[in-house]
């Protein structure tokens, strides 16, 4: 999604939004990620406005204290950024790819089923289609990518062919390389 996105000069509008829309965004994010309820004050401090930046390709960035924390495409679900996920790693379920898939994940490729079922890979939680996941790499501590399940974990294990996870945001893409918009 962010392979070719240039954030410098690409934003159409950079507005502090109305308080009702701020509440809607905050409530939508909290409903989507219930584990954030415990750290709500850290993520959404009082008296700090939420800024929404609209970029090319219908991508909206959610900024708090000039730091990009979440993004979405059109009116779709909100995804956390990798920097935010590294601060709060338990807000998303984890899947792990094997060592052979790491290079391709870091280049923005979608994750194939075989990279999730081979030795070294892990899928410990049963996940449905369209679940947002943190993609971990074998032998690494932090998430390498954020993706959306294109098959359930049971289907990935049984079919073991085709794309299992769509890679949405990965280490080294343009969003990761520019965490602040100034």
Swiss-Prot record:
Ranges for domain PUA come to 92-172
GO annotation, biological process: formation of translation preinitiation complex
Cellular-component GO terms for this entry: cytoplasm
Q: Which GO terms describe its molecular function?
A: RNA binding
User: Which Pfam family would be a valid example here?
Assistant: PUA
Claim: Cell cycle is one of the keywords in the record: yes
Keywords in alphabetical order, please.
Cell cycle, Cytoplasm, Transcription, Transcription regulation
Localization (cell): Cytoplasm
- UniProt record similarity statement: Belongs to the MCTS1 family.
Q: Fill in the domain comment.
A: The PUA RNA-binding domain is critical for cap binding, but not sufficient for translation enhancer function. MCT1 N-terminal region is required to enhance translation possibly through interaction with other proteins.
> What exactly does this protein do?
May play a role in cell cycle regulation. May play a role as translation enhancer by binding to the cap complex of the 5'-terminus of mRNAs.
Task: State the name under which the record lists this protein.
Answer: Malignant T-cell-amplified sequence 1 homolog
């Amino acid at each position: 999604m962010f392979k070719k996105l240039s954030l410098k000069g690409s934003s159409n509008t950079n507005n502090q939004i109305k308080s009702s829309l701020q509440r809607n965004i905050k409530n939508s994010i909290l409903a989507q990620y219930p584990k954030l309820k415990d750290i709500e004050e850290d993520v959404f401090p009082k008296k700090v406005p939420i800024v929404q930046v609209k970029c090319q390709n219908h991508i909206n960035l959610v900024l708090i204290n000039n730091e990009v924390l979440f993004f979405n495409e059109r009116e779709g679900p909100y995804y956390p950024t990798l920097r935010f996920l590294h601060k709060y790693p338990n807000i998303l379920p984890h899947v792990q790819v094997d060592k052979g898939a790491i290079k391709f994940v870091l280049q923005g490729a979608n994750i194939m089923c075989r990279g999730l079922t081979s030795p070294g890979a892990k899928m410990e939680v049963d996940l449905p289609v369209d679940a947002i996941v943190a993609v971990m790499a074998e032998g690494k501590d932090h998430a390498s990518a954020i993706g959306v399940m294109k098959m359930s974990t049971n289907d990935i294990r049984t079919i073991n062919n085709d794309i299992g996870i769509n890679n949405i945001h990965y280490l080294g893409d343009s969003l990761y390389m520019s965490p602040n918009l100034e």
